Regions:
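Positively charged
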Residues: 1-180
Length: 180
């Protein structure tokens, strides 16, 4: 079911979300949450979404990136749920992308993040998995996982002159790489 997106200013986006238990993964509530996340992500046009963004303060985020996306980056990550994720920074060299967020509609901001990360998480069955990622996918992972810890991309913009409305971004900003 498509849910309304919680926007910046809603306190749920500023809380650390609750870890879930393995028993929870067997519940109807969990299955429904996954459907709601996917429906809401697709409807609102995101490449990832975290549970707090649809009003559920649980440590669950989903990401789906296939082929060349509209940001000109080729990344392949089939629909994946990251449950109770932990992030490890493998290469602290930073890279910057213009980011956007369903919870901060109409804006774009240039954010520098670690170039390479390793995420350890539970899959849908509660089995531990890990994923190493670099480049654009590393940024997407950091953006989505930040949502589980009360952080928005705007918090990570170092130079606020690089925060722009979408229309002005389209008109004045040369860099094409950005994410929703
Ligand atoms: Zn976001």
């Amino acid at each position: 079911m498509i849910k309304a997106i919680c926007r910046m200013g809603n306190p749920i986006l500023r809380k650390t979300a609750q870890p879930v238990t393995k028993d929870y993964l067997k519940t109807e509530d969990f299955s429904q949450l996954l459907v709601d996340l996917k429906d809401s992500m697709n409807h609102h046009g995101g490449i990832g979404i975290a549970a707090p963004q649809i009003g559920v303060s649980k440590q669950i985020a989903i990401i789906e990136l296939m082929g060349f996306n509209r940001y000109g980056q080729e990344v392949n990550l089939p629909l994946t749920a990251f449950i109770n994720p932990k992030i490890e920074y493998i290469d602290l060299t930073v890279q910057g992308f213009w980011e956007g967020c369903l919870s901060v509609p109409g804006l774009r901001g240039f954010v520098e993040r670690a170039q390479k990360v390793k995420v350890t998480y539970w899959d849908l069955n509660g089995n531990e998995q890990s994923l190493e990622a670099e480049g654009f996918l590393a940024t997407v992972l950091q953006h989505e996982l930040d949502h589980l810890f009360g952080v928005l991309y705007v918090d990570r913009i170092k130079d606020l002159t690089l925060l722009s409305y979408q229309e002005e971004y389209n008109e004045f900003v040369i860099q094409k790489a950005s994410l929703d």
